[in-house]
Amino acid sequence: MKLNKKQIIKIQKNRDPYLLIDYATKIIPGKSVEGYKILKKNEWFFKVHWPGDPNMPGMLQVESMIQMSSLIVFTLPNMNGKTLYLVDCNNLKFFKKIVPGDKLKIVSKLISNNRCLYNFESAGQIKKKIACKATFTLVLPGSLYINPGK
């Protein structure tokens, strides 16, 4: 399965300028996804992060991986248009600056699904070199109570 930006907008709730993925080239619902974010010179965050040395903020790199990963769930039956919240992020690493003109390839896989908790591994690549990676958990809001601990 493939999705262009218009199709992505139909199945998930993020919108420009916060929609941080452009298209998915390969989706296996409930399993994995590959897709891209094209970093244009006029992206809103390049103006402020950092003047003279523009690069994609790390948390927006994470958000791109989350948005791409969510397509694995949103392409499942009866999941179109739902919302997923980030509840955990681990093993977060940044290896390379992502700059204007880069083509960020995002590869994600669903590693486990326990009720409404979805655990993912994801990596962003620039020219076949890993730029960022993380494991994280997304949850359907209201589906279960997350106890913050004591």
Residue ranges with predicted function:
Residues M1-K2, S69-V107, A131-P141:
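Hydrophobic beta-strand-centered segment that forms part of the acyl-chain substrate-binding groove
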Residues G30, I98-K105, K109-K150:
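HotDog/MaoC-like acyl-thioester-processing domains
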Residues I21-T25, L86-V87, L110:
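A structural signal for short, hydrophobic beta-strand segments that form beta-sheets
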Residues M1-T25, T137-L138, N147:
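Flexible, low-complexity linker/boundary loops enriched in proline and small hydrophobic residues
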